[in-house]
Amino acid sequence: QAVLIEKVRNHANISVLENRMAVDLITGAKLGLTAAAERSRVLGLYVLDQTTGRVEAIAAAHTVLATGGAGKVYLYTTNPDSASGDGVAMAWRAGCRVANMEFMQFHPTCLYHPQAKSFLISEVLRGEGGLLKLPGANGELGERFMPRHDSRAELAPRDVVARSIDFEIKKRGLDCVYLDMRHKGEAFLRSHFPTIFARCLELGINIAEQPIPVVPAAHYSCGGVVTDLAGRTDLESLYAVGETAYTGLHGANRLASNSLLECVVFGDAVAENILAQSRELPAALPPWDETRVTDADEEVVVAHNWDELRRAMWNYVGIVRTDKRLERAANRIALLKKETEEFYSRFRVTRDLLELRNLETVADLMVRSARSRNESRGLH
């Protein structure tokens, strides 16, 4: 990543705009153009400059959505804080199709710690003999529970392990379960898992002496904005790649490492397609209208709604779903969306508000997709 960033910064034809967040795409239809070809074209986007609080209009001959997944829609995720589904939400609002939004892959073991909410505890630890156990009394560990769920115990596929942990946590009202590696010894753990050992030690957990608190966490979005094999979406001059896109590669589940290959292959395909097109910039775009908004007086509402949304998604649209749970989620998300849209129309935008708005859009799409699939398949 560091090498890639350095190459981007040093490239003569790339201008990096930092501390910016996309607000929405600008289409011909949004500007009131009448010709069919112009109405379906993306002309650029509005962008929030987080240092000044001002929204800028940026014209573009071609726009590529590469904003990553939407793991932050859940209470626990291995994704970075920026994984708020921005690209999917913006594309949907602009008129693109999305698909397979119900298929969210969950990793079974994310570290449960307030200072490291997205640190992934590799499945290799279970492959090397790690045991999943319930919390017990007086600070001791309880029983090992995986043999009750699958004959392969801790070596069962990740979806089975994640579902089993989720079952135990929700059935017993637990915060987490524990991955016990103490029987492997400090020398083995330091040599085989140096990064995990060091990070846990920084957080006050010596995994040679203490069990690791873990929870399942949202890991990878298999759905996204529908594209063709060149990364083109339903809108002219708009592309989507990576976890933002639904290319059809992953289907209802993702095989390990295929996501990286997808980024490389489709990233190249998008670049080749853009190079073959005209790169003439559209005419000047209208400025962002702030004549009817003021500074927010109750920003705490955004934080509260964010927390409520993520908890609702975790409880009702998580690893195990039912019609009743999905109905409850749909009702709660509808109320949250209504509140946020009112907030959005009255106050100046902030990063937190934009991310909440996008997360609510993505959450709604996930629930609608899940309710429309009346079968258990893949990750649903």
Describe the function of each predicted region:
Residues 8-22, 98-101:
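A conserved beta-strand/loop element that lines the FAD pocket in flavoprotein oxidoreductases
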Residues 194-239:
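FAD/FMN-dependent oxidoreductases across multiple families
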Residues 133-155, 165-168, 220-222, 226-240, ...:
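Glycine- and aromatic-enriched mobile tails/lids
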Residues 51, 60-62, 66-71, 244:
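Glycine-/small-residue-rich beta->alpha transition segments that form the dinucleotide
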Residues 1-6, 17, 77-85, 110, ...:
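Short beta-strand to alpha-helix junction loop
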Residues 52-62, 234-237:
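Core beta-strand elements of the Rossmann-like FAD/NAD(P) dinucleotide-binding domain
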Residues 90, 96-212, 264, 273-280:
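An anion/pyrophosphate-binding glycine-rich loop and adjacent beta-alpha core
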Residues 18-41:
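A conserved short coil-to-beta-strand element within the FAD-binding core of flavoproteins
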